[in-house]
Design a protein with these regions (language model features):
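Short, small-residue-biased leader/transition segments that mark boundaries at the very start
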Residues: 1-8, 310-314
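C-terminal beta-strand-rich structural cap/linker in extracellular carbohydrate-active enzymes
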Residues: 288-308, 312
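Short, acidic/polar
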Residues: 30-44, 161-165
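Surface-exposed beta-strand/loop patches in extracellular or lumenal glycoproteins
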Residues: 262-274
């Protein structure tokens, strides 16, 4: 093709970014290339897909997304657009959701004893201030990159893996990601470039755990993503013990309170509510104001107006 219509950046040969030798760098300065990219997206939307996860979205000029995605929304109302990146500008007229990478690495650090619940509270405030209120933040303990290159959640988080998963379902503005195999506690690093079949699916305690998390989220408006959900309040304030992440979210007449021990030591605290409430996972009744002890990496969840369910231990 001619230089004017070439969709690739070249210096003699096509330019390759990083060591991605199978991916030539596109020329986003070429209007014809941009139009071709939009046409390719329409091709798949015409076939009924729900939307796109855009890989390395921050490596593409923001103005391309801001030019292309609103036009697609007009033609295909209700599409879902996820950016693999977390620059606030990605939400400026472009994406619905972005990856909460900083949170992911923070959860790893807390599990490994390098960071604390106080660091998590600071993150929640910082992210809420940086991101638009309507932004969905994709939260995860594993994904295809982290599993293959950094290890499974069990390698990185050990005994903290489940409480960290709970946080991805309950923290403000979050939209949880469950990676292949997590729903059955599959402790295996998938080969990134080679065939590595997923084993036969078997229901177990992890399946019940994730099913409970999904039900908790779906039946509680307070846990909705973006502007529909509640922001974090900290009922114990400065009386919150080190190691404890205790927060409440309220929306639509619904309240969810999460108490998570993010340390390798037990933690004691007073339940910050009046009257009695049933804990979501166990169905056990707790009286507000009473002294409670949480073992290492354990949690309590109190959801208002939600019928209790019981799950088996993994």
């Amino acid at each position: 093709s001619s230089a004017a219509s070439d969709v690739y950046k070249r210096q003699g040969n096509t330019i390759v970014q990083y060591d991605w030798t199978d991916i030539a760098k596109l020329d986003y300065g070429n209007a014809d290339m941009r139009a071709a990219m939009a046409a390719a997206m329409r091709f798949w939307l015409d076939r009924g897909i729900d939307g796109f996860r855009c890989d390395m979205a921050c490596e593409v000029p923001i103005d391309f997304w801001q030019q292309t995605l609103p036009a697609l929304r007009k033609e295909y109302p209700g599409i879902y657009l996820l950016a693999e990146g977390e620059a606030p500008a990605l939400h400026d007229g472009a994406f619905d959701a972005s990856y909460a990478w900083e949170l992911h690495h923070l959860l790893n650090d807390i599990a490994q004893g390098r960071k604390s619940a106080a660091d998590l509270r600071a993150y929640v405030a910082r992210d809420a201030a940086a991101m638009p209120r309507e932004a969905f933040r994709l939260m995860f303990t594993s994904n295809h990159d982290e599993n293959s290159w950094a290890g499974t959640e069990f390698e990185r988080m050990g005994d903290a893996a489940r409480v960290m998963a709970l946080l991805t379902f309950t923290l403000p503005n979050g939209q949880p990601l469950v990676y292949t195999g997590q729903e059955m506690g599959f402790d295996h690093r998938f080969e990134f470039f080679e065939k590595d079949p997923v084993p036969a699916w078997e229901r177990n305690g992890f399946t019940d755990f994730y099913a409970a998390l999904i039900r908790l989220r779906h039946e509680n408006p307070a846990l909705a993503a973006g502007e529909r959900g509640g922001q974090a309040a900290y009922p114990l304030g400065e009386r919150t013990p080190d190691g404890l992440m205790l927060f409440s979210r309220t929306a639509g007449g619904n309240e969810v309170t999460v108490a998570a021990n993010l340390s390798a030591e037990e933690v004691a605290f007073d339940l910050p509510f009046e009257g009695s409430r049933r804990e979501f996972f166990t169905g056990k009744e707790y009286t507000g104001g009473t002294r409670t002890v949480l073992p290492a990496w354990q949690w309590l969840v109190f959801a208002q107006d939600l019928s209790l369910i019981h799950i088996s231990e993994p």
